[in-house]
Amino acid sequence: FLMAELKITAANFENEVLRSDKPVLLDFYADWCGPCKMLAPVLHEIAEESTGAFKVGKINVDEQMELAMRFQVSSIPMLVVFKDGKAVAKSVGYRPKSEIAAMVEGAR
């Protein structure tokens, strides 16, 4: 089982997200969150179909409280698109695949 999504932590955040030469779609989630579980397969499809044009990263807010606080995550799932080290788009709650894809396209 190969993860198309990257596990993002405080340790690799700068390298994988801020210094990325490609846009990064970040998913702030928790294992106990119902909508996050619904969103997971959608994000997995998006990651597999990205063909390397962008990256998809997942941040477990229970394990990465520092990052959750840094980005003021009050409600999950929260999706943030980063480009050139800056957050350029954000959405909270479950979103259909088409909306997420459009969000990422807008950052390319």
Regions found by a protein language model. Name each.
Residues L6-V24:
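A short beta-strand-turn-helix
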Residues D21-K22, Y29-W32, S75:
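Short pre-active-site segment immediately N-terminal to redox-active cysteine/selenocysteine motifs
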Residues V61-A68:
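Structural microenvironment flanking redox-active thiols in thiol-disulfide oxidoreductases
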Residues S75-R108:
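Non-catalytic, surface beta->alpha helical segment in thiol-disulfide oxidoreductase systems
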Residues F1-L2:
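Short, Lys/Arg-enriched N-terminal segments with co-localized hydrophobic residues
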Residues F28-V42:
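Conserved redox-active cysteine motifs that mediate thiol-disulfide chemistry
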Residues F13, L26, L43, N60, ...:
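Residue-level signature of catalytic and energy-coupling elements of molecular machines
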Residues D21-P23, A40-I59:
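Conserved helix-turn-beta segment immediately C-terminal to the redox Cys motif
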